[in-house]
Curated annotation (Swiss-Prot):
GO biological process terms, semicolon-separated: regulation of DNA-templated transcription
InterPro entries per UniProt: Arc_rbn_hlx_hlx, CopG
Gene: yiiE
Disordered, as annotated region: 51-72
Native organism: Escherichia coli O6:K15:H31 (strain 536 / UPEC)
Residues in the signal sequence: none
Protein name: Uncharacterized protein YiiE
C-alpha cells in the first residue's frame, strides 16, 4: 500500500505519552498513529454513511464536530 506523509502538531504531553507507548509496544510512533487513525476512521464509517443519505425524514445526524464535508 502506498503511504503519504502527514505532519501533526501534538502537545509535549501527547509526545511523551506516545514515546512511552512506543517503548512498551516496540513499534514506531508512526505505526501507533497509523493504527489510531485507522481505528478512528473505522468507527466513523457508519455515521458518515448514514449522513450521506441514509437519514430518515427529519432525523438529525451528528458525525463529528470536526467533520465539515465528506467527499467520495
Amino acid at each position: 500500500m502506498a503511504m503519504n506523509t502527514v505532519f501533526l502538531h501534538l502537545s509535549e504531553e501527547a509526545i511523551k505519552r506516545l514515546n512511552k507507548l512506543r517503548g512498551w509496544r516496540k513499534v514506531s510512533r508512526s505505526a501507533i498513529l497509523r493504527e489510531a487513525v485507522e481505528q478512528y476512521l473505522e468507527r466513523q464509517q457508519f455515521p458518515v454513511r448514514k449522513a450521506k443519505g441514509g437519514r430518515q425524514r427529519g432525523e438529525t445526524v451528528v458525525v463529528d464536530d470536526q467533520c465539515k464535508e465528506h467527499k467520495e
